[in-house]
Amino acid sequence: MEDIEKLLLQEKILMLELDLVRAKISLARAKGSMQQGGNSLHRETPVKEEAVHSALATFAPIQAKAIPEQTAPGKESTNPLMVSILPKDMKSVQTEKKRLVTPMDFLRPNQGIQIPQKSEPNSSVAPNRAESGIQHPHSNYYVVYNGPHAGIYDDWGSAKAATNGVPGVAHKKFATITEARAAADVYTTAQQAERLNFIPKGEAQLKPKSFVKALTSPPKQKAQWLTLGVKKPSSDPAPKEVSFDQETTMDDFLYLYDLGRRFDGEGDDTVFTTDNESISLFNFRKNANPEMIREAYNAGLIRTIYPSNNLQEIKYLPKKVKDAVKKFRTNCIKNTEKDIFLKIKSTIPVWQDQGLLHKPKHVIEIGVSKKIVPKESKAMESKDHSEDLIELATKTGEQFIQSLLRLNDKKKIFVNLVEHDTLVYSKNTKETVSEDQRAIETFQQRVITPNLLGFHCPSICHFIKRTVEKEGGAYKCHHCDKGKAIVQDASADSKVADKEGPPLTTNVEKEDVSTTSSKASG
């Protein structure tokens, strides 16, 4: 009897060892399949390995316990420690999972699921902020040609600060960096100056205008504010906005002047001219070139503009003038779809050796336009006026004064805009109010002086004197009286010319305050 029990115990031990060998073989096969990357296996490898390891852990203490005697040999109940339970577990685990994976998936991070990564910036872009590294397009670029802060800017605020209060600075706006760079290179090459640098937004360092100012200016101190009892002082007024239009040169003016004299109406139906003996003025219809309108406006060579409803033709005129036209369309006429006109009276520029001396002054009338009947443009004889531009400026100045004084005869006027050198008005259904009348008188007193062209012009002075005396007023010019006293003390053969040009080397003296009667100003 004891021999039978020993044999049965030996049988159980051998069965356990056999099961252990089978488990090792299965584990070795699983590892070999994972290393070879077999794609034909569709099973949950981690679950099986976990089951095998749990079985091995159970077999670790190789100690067999005696089982109770059975009714018949070989009819024992199933041993729960046998490895035969592994296939059942594997099948149950496999049915629980919907997605089948391969062993190679477990060697990859995140079980083979790719995680989207952020795209790296293009390595071709240079790290520095040079012109080639501009990735985002800007609406405009500004070239400041000269002055202490010359350069190419991509920010309106920096460029405006670089030009405010700087006399004689030249600047212009461009749509692209390529155009701005080309214009800057042309200027620096002609002036034999250094190449202008590109100054991005935030990197502009505006220095004092001169070393003298830097030495004499005291260092700024931070204001110390008290919580109570001290009123915070108001900030300094913002500087006047500077338009980014390059100053009209004498060559530009002579080109436009000659273009108007030679224009015969062929090739462009958006422009026609009004001609007289000495000058031809442009009239612009719908769809005219807005850049040409701007150049002609700055040269004082426009008579009339007939803009479209969207006002695209005048988009490059000064902002306040455009705003005045928009307000007239929306507030002063019932049908906003009606065509309008801008009738302009202007002086022309005057130059001296140092540059532009006088910018044109403008009186603009806005009104509702009827059917346009353009006059036939005629090619006129063009003369070289480079030597007698002062005479031409004097004639246009006298005509400008006459048109400004005619406002005194109009009783129904609405003033749309009053600036230092521009007056915009329109006809009104009501009588002119006192506020508008004062605005007109103030503009007349500021503009109608012998210094209308930027210097004391005897011809303008005599014209004002004749006009005022014709109206029954009194006029006296201190500058002319002083000149007469000098002439009386001079020798008999000395003569005084009726026309004088602008001073070429001396500073331009300030505008004289001429005495006029109340009738002269309306």
Curated annotation (Swiss-Prot):
UniProt protein name: Transactivator/viroplasmin protein
Job description of the protein: Enhances the ribosomal termination-reinitiation event leading to the translation of major open reading frames on the polycistronic viral RNAs.
Comment field (misc): The inclusion bodies are the site of viral DNA synthesis, virion assembly and accumulation in the infected cell.
GO cellular component: host cell cytoplasm
Residue ranges, compositional bias (Polar residues): 111-126
Region annotation Disordered: where it falls in the sequence: 111-133, 491-522
Subcellular location field: Host cytoplasm
Similarity field: Belongs to the caulimoviridae viroplasmin family.
Keywords associated with the record: Host cytoplasm, Translation regulation
Gene Ontology biological process terms, A to Z: regulation of translation
